[in-house]
Amino acid sequence: MKIQTLGFDWDSGNRRKCRKHGLHLVDIETFFRQSSLFVMPDIHHSRSEERHIAFGSSLKGRPMLVAFTFRIREEEVLIRPISARYMHEKEAKEYEKKGTEI
């Protein structure tokens, strides 16, 4: 089976969760198109599906994180954002510290 390139899977639920934290769809889609993301499994929330957390920065340089999973629709792998937000100050400092160690 041939799998096409990534797209995004949006519905009213995940749009609402992301907007709640001041982020728009374009912010999140742009975030995933960057090459400087750090992605790790979200083992605490992966009971019914495999979830991941991506750490990186917005185009304006503001640290943010996105919880997401993958969905396959019509042989295309889609990124399904679950929630997205800007990092809290403590998280951002930890991310910056770890980023220098990678």
Task: Give residue spans per PLM region.
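Ribonuclease/tRNase effector modules and their secretory precursors
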Residues: 1-102
